[in-house]
Every structure is written in C-alpha cells, then in structure tokens.
Amino acid sequence: MNTQPQFQLKKETLFSETETTNSKQLAILKANFPQCFDKNGAFIQEKLLEIVKSSDVELSKESYSLNWLGKSYARLLANLPPKTLLSEDKDHNQREENKNSQNLLIKGDNLEVLKHMVNAYSEKVKMIYIDPPYNTGKDGFAYNDDRKFTPEQLSDLAGIDLDEAKRILEFTTNGSSSHSAWLTFIYPRLYIARELLREDGVIFISIDENELNQLKTICDEIFGEANFIENIVWNKRIPKNDKGIGNIHEYILAYAKNNEISKEFLMRKDGIDDVYQFIEKLKKEKVPLDKAEQQLKKFYSSNGYDRGITLYNCLNEDYRPWGKINMSWPNADSFGPTYEVLHPLTNNPVKIPDRGWRWKEGTFNHIAKRIDGKYADIKKLHDGSVICGGIWFASTENTQPSSVKFLDEVEEFLLRSIISTKSDGGVEVENLFGGKGYFSYPKPTSLIKTLFGSVKTEDKDIYLDFFAGSGTTAHGILELNIEDGRKRNFICVQLDEETDKKKQAYKEGYKSIFNIT
C-alpha cells in the first residue's frame, strides 16, 4: 500500500489541561441550547426539560450503562486536544507514483490521528471499518499510555477522587489487558470516530466473543441504541485444532450515524463475478448451449455455490444465465388461485399446483404474453422446451411451468446477518509477499468488499480504517473501484509498531507493521 501519500505524527508539547471529561458535550449544549445557561454559565435543567416536553418526546425512567475503572479517563481522552503534530512524508509523497493519489496512509497513534482528523474531516467520512485487538489474551493487547498525568491532575480533570485516579494510572502505565483496560483503550477512539461520520455514515467493527458484550454496550452509549443496525456473524473458516466446540465465526457490529438516513444495505452474491467470467469464457469459445449448460452446472458443483446462484443454470441465446422459479402458491396455511393454463405447444392444460398458482390469472397472462388465450411470443429452446414471455414450459404439459428469472436481476440482495466468505485473508497476504505469511488472521478482501459495497456510494466518498494492519481495507477499496468504476477514497492509519523479532517479517527487513501496510 506504499503508493499512497504518507503522513506521520511528531511529538510536541501541545498538551492542554483546559479540557475536562465532558468539554465537548458541554460545548454542544451551549451552542445549541444557549437559553439553558444563565449568565454565569450554570446549566438550567428545567429549561431543557421544557424543550423536550414541548416536542412530544417521551421521557424514559429506565436506563442502564456500563461502568468500569477508567471510564472517566476514557471520556477525558476523547475530549483532550492532540499532543502531537501531523507532518508530511515529503520524500515519499513527491515520488511520481504518489503525487496524484487521493488516498492517505498515516503513521502514528490512531487516537492522536483521529483528534487531528476532526479538524479536516468532521462529518465527512462515509464509512469506517476497524479490526481492533480482540483482547483474547493471546493477541498481544496491552494498554500502554504515555500521557504523563499526576494523580492530582487526573483527579481534577476527570472529576474523580484521588484514589481512583491512582488506580487508573496504575493500569494505564503497566500494560494491563483487563476488560477495563480494553474499554478505556477503545472508548475514546470510537467517540471521535463518530464525529468523523457523515449523517448517512456507517461504522463496522470486527470483534469476537471476548469483548462483544462490552463493545455492544459502549457503542449503544456512543452511537445511540436507536442507531444499532445489526450484529453480523461472519463465518470465517473451518475449525482448525480447536478444542471443545469448533469456533468458525466472529462478529461485526454495525452502527449508523443516523439510522433514519442509512436505511438499505445490499450485498452481491458471493462468487458471482467468477460465474460471469466462466460464462464469458464459454461464450467466447462458442460452446453449444446444451454443452455450455452442462459445464456451468459442473462449475457450480465443483465450487460449492449456494442455491442463490446454482438455481440459475440455464443460458439463453446470448449466454445470459437464468433460472426456473416455482410458480406454486408459497404459503403453507392458505391456497392460491386455480385456473386453467394451456400448454403453448400441445394446447392441453398443464398440471395445477396442489396449493394453486402464485399469481392471479390476469398477472399470469401479462407475464406470459397471453392475449385472448394465445401466446404472442413463443421461443423454442435446444431441449424442446419453450419460453413464452417470462414463463418457461417443458416440452409437454406433464411438467408445471416456471417463471423465468435472470441471474443479473437478482445479483444483489439485502445484506445478511450471516456472511460467509470463500477467500482466506492469510492466503491473500501470502500471495502478496511471495508465499510468506507476515500477519496472523488478516481479514479477506472479499469481506471488506461485501461491507463497503453494501452502501450506495458516490465518487470521492471517504472510507476510514484506523487499525489498518495488513492494509486489507485499502486493498478492498482499490479492487471495488476497479470493479464498479467508482472513485472511493481511503484513509488508513497504522501505529509504527515494531514487528515481533522472532517472526519472518522482522528477519526480512519489515521492522514495523507500518512497513508492511
């Protein structure tokens, strides 16, 4: 991913102690509800309640929240200004291949980078995907913080007692991997990430069972419970060397900035582009349709496609794949209309489904182009069957007719709450680096493309990943742009974290993860 403009953080003494735990929230209240503050800046609760009540907003008497040692500190971190400067990597950016890129790769602590981004990218990011540390106990997560507070400073800024401040500073400086440490780490990053999202923006967060429940609760707090979209299950692999129960899935929490705007999420059927490429090959080779259909069925079988694709195993004269859709009444607890349908070749009535037809007779006649009892358009197929308008008939009346549906008419459907991907992220990274696996369990580009491709996009929409890792997000966006002709832009952030000296990546000169990104 090193063909993108690069920026890096430089540490400076820019720390300000004027911010407190709720500085941003208070500023928003003052800007939007100035009438709720007196001349001394004191908040007048009753006036805000008057506004709420006059707007017919129901007041809830029930609420809950997740509290942990360090939450007050996490909220303070979200409000503090950056303590660094962002500088350009001029040598890299002036290279000819990087000059005109609209994408950004930033090296540094993502919390600091996010704080800088608020100035230029507030409410400008279309979509965020992050794959943060899962805190499994084996992924190397340990909270480390170089912000040099004294207990007295932290107590004053966060509004907590001195003893709590001391306990917080103890785990922030000692590399803790507790639930509290992880929550303190992730909370301010998500809080600022929300500020970057557009009103129609969406965030996807990968996680596993170790922190799922905690993450869901703080996301409800940050993004609003009403803006929760789905907890997507990602079927990732066949279990390998698992004990007890084979773990084959992870989770992806999805939240909208405003769920009233972000309504529909679509996904392309997995593997459909490979199907189109195979059919195009058959067409170029001018394989006869009957043999082409046989080869297509074998292709489906050998690649394990699901019924959403394998149903479309017929080809028309232009090699456009289509399938036969059952015309029986779909509801088991009721019956559909029954009427006589004549076969277009034999003129004998076809068998009526046990529960009746799916459509009324008028609808059937319209789709079949049947006018005054006669079919206006009859196309004979290579196997003796025929198509009349949008209805398929077998060569005799002994088989029930089916409606005709083309694969390209149904290649997209609503994003499912369970996503399965055929590709392996580890193999993809190995292929990029000559068969060498420098990353453990990277996400496959197909997953990123499914998520990012699910939302309607415009040219120059910005996509953000502030746990860039192997660069899968950037890779996926570049592939999406090639496939659909869009011009999405990405911003990827990665800490200049040293690679494990025992790993192959370090031995071959990749001293930091950023070098690989």
Model-derived regions, located:
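Flexible, glycine-/basic-rich loop-and-beta segments that form/coincide
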Residues: 240-310
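Segments forming glycine/polar-rich beta-alpha architectures that bind adenosine-containing cofactors
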Residues: 116, 120-121, 129, 289-432, ...
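Secondary-structure transition/capping motifs at alpha-helix termini
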Residues: 121-125, 194-201, 221-231, 454-461, ...
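Short, surface-exposed recognition loops and adjoining beta-strand edges that mediate ligand/DNA contacts
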Residues: 226-244
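Conserved Class I SAM-dependent methyltransferase catalytic core
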Residues: 168-231, 491, 514-516
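DnaQ-like (DEDDh/DEDDy) 3′-5′ exonuclease domain used for proofreading
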Residues: 1-129, 134-188, 359, 369-378
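Conserved S-adenosyl-L-methionine
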Residues: 68, 110, 141-154, 183, ...
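Short, solvent-exposed loop/turn and secondary-structure capping segments
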Residues: 117, 137-147, 216-217, 231, ...
